[in-house]
Amino acid sequence: MTVYKKGDIVLVPFPFSDQTFIKKRPAVIISSDVYNSHSLDIIIMAVTSNLKNSIMTNECEIKDYSSAGLLKPSIIKSAISTIDKSLVLKRLGSLSSEDSDSLNKILRELLAL
């Protein structure tokens, strides 16, 4: 079985917030490496390249999107989901250390840690 790490960008069927539809989209793994190595699930946040609206305070830009395996500038949305690892279609890349730091900052703010 593939071992996923925090900060990996994966392609997954991600549910819409109303749970009525599912769309294949990139997501970033936010669960810890220890959790990922022992669990059948991973915890993810949605990634979007739809930059029409300004970035909200609980979102962060992926500055090094090419290292993340993304084709265009993207942001990490605040939509969090837990999915079975078997639903991962493929690993696209991983966040740079700068983008990982930005994600950790957003997680601390979003979850009041």
Name the predicted role of every residue range.
Residues 1-113:
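Conserved functional hotspots at enzyme active or ligand-binding sites that engage polyanionic ligands
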